């Protein structure tokens, strides 16, 4: 299952396009910009189709189980007393943060660069990469005579990377990273014509509203970590279904509303 095992390439492709525009965009011809940025998103869409196709086979063999691919762990796992200690992961020493949950359980805080594919994320993956590819293709003509052509496509590629990270993240921390990236790109794209006062004002308004959403997201994330002792979607879902937590608990309701 080459597509599933390399699902991390889907967000990486537009990220590479954005990085290329950042460092070399000024020197590139429009044709080259189109090949790099539009090509990256089209490849991401084709790769997404392959990944979803292979996921259908995976789901038949593992009904109800999402596919997860953990690329790197920057906060390790383990058990022990509350505090900070190192843990070995992949031959490297990773920081390990252990805290007490609401019911007094010691819980290691886990944060991965990991990706998850399930029926819901599969639908959104195809939608975002497919529509994103069409937007990129349309923009090659719509923005053809605009100053800052490379900058616009750099923003679009960065937006695709952030949105795909948000969709495929297997934990709340990485999802928050994607959310922040989407907010940043919204600000950059809305304010693309920064010399126009109306565009600058609209971009600032969007930035402020997103920061309000960030506060709620963070509070909801911290509440889930404190209540369940985990930030991975699969573990939180398993604990929620275990029967040890009351569905009508005001804390769960509050965390849901904050998110």
Language model features by range: what are they?
Residues 1-259:
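...captures the hydrophobic TM-helix bundle architecture rather than a specific catalytic motif
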């Amino acid at each position: 299952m080459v597509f599933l095992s390399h699902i991390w390439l889907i967000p990486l492709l537009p990220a590479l396009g954005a990085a290329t525009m950042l460092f070399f965009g000024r020197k590139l011809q429009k044709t080259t910009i189109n090949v790099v940025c539009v090509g990256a998103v089209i490849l991401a869409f084709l790769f997404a189709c392959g990944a979803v196709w292979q996921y259908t086979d995976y789901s038949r063999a593992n009904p109800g189980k999402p596919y997860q691919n953990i690329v790197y762990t920057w906060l390790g796992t383990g058990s022990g007393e509350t505090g900070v200690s190192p843990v070995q992961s992949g031959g490297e020493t990773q920081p390990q943060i252990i805290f007490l949950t609401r019911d007094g359980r010691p819980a290691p805080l886990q944060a991965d660069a990991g990706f998850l594919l399930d029926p819901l994320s599969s639908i959104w993956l195809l939608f975002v990469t497919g529509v994103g590819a069409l937007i990129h293709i349309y923009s090659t003509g719509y923005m053809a005579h605009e100053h800052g052509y490379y900058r616009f496509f750099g923003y679009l590629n960065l937006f695709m990377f952030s949105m795909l990270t948000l969709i495929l993240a297997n934990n709340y921390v990485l999802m928050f990273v994607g959310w922040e990236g989407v907010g940043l790109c919204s600000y950059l794209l809305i304010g693309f014509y920064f010399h126009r006062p109306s565009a600058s004002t609209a971009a600032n308004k969007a930035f402020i509203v997103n920061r309000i959403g960030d506060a709620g997201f963070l509070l909801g994330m911290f509440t889930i970590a404190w209540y369940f002792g985990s930030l991975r979607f699969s573990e939180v879902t398993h604990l929620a279904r275990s029967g040890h937590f009351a569905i009508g608990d005001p804390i769960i309701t509050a965390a849901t509303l904050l998110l």
